[in-house]
Amino acid sequence: MLVVLLTAALLVLSSAHGSDEEVIYEDSSSQLLDVEQQNQKHGQHHQKPPPASDENGDGDDSDDGDDDGSGDDGNRPERPPPHGGNHQRPPPGHHHGPPPSGGPQTSSQPGNPQGPPPQGGPQGPPQPGNPQGPPPQGGPQQRPPQPGKPQGPPPQGGPQGPPQPGNPQGPPPQGGHQQRPPQPRKPQDPAQDATHEQPSYLWFSS
């Protein structure tokens, strides 16, 4: 009977708890069996004196009753211990159960803060990259135009300078052309003079 009760209690507890707790229950059940055996021995010792005090005729019956009673008495006091043991067992089992469940919760919490840092890391690098990008862009834009502008005007000023002396050179030839045409006109005048001279020849011819 005791073994049946213990096995039933173990089955109920095992269904409620994990396999790890079953090992603990098995160890505790073995200890309970030892305690129950000791209780039975003590019960037999205590029950033997009463038959001696009873009448001799009832001694045989008392012996039989003792055997039966010992079984009943042994069962009765033995029942509470396993129940008590069962009540005591769950608390340690519960304590063991929640810690592992709490462990993953705590691990998940540190995991969350670990997640955002890597996200913040990629956000940080782009910021320094942005300032690096504009400086090179601004540098080439500012440098080439500055030297290019001063270089551009000097050559422009150079060609502008020569045309100025060229301009005076230009007008003189133009003036020469203007003066030259009147020169051929001058020979036209001598032609006219020749016409005037013709009468002189005429005078000679005459």
From Swiss-Prot:
Residue numbers spanned by region Disordered: 15-206
Biased composition (Pro residues): 113-174
Ranges of biased composition (kind: Low complexity): 103-112
The protein's role, per its UniProt record: May protect teeth by binding to tannins.
Keyword Lipoprotein: no
Organism listed in the record: Rattus norvegicus (Rat)
This protein's UniProt keywords: Repeat, Secreted, Signal
Location of the protein in the cell: Secreted
Annotated GO CC locations: extracellular region
Main localisation: secreted
A Pfam family assignment: Pro-rich
Repeat (Sequence) residue spans along the chain: 80-97, 98-115, 116-133, 134-152, 153-170, 171-189
Name recorded for this polypeptide: Acidic proline-rich protein PRP33
Cleavable signal peptide: 1-13
Region (6 X 18 AA approximate tandem repeats): 80-189
Keyword Signal carried by entry: yes
InterPro entries reported for this sequence: Pro-rich
Composition-biased stretches (Acidic residues): 55-71
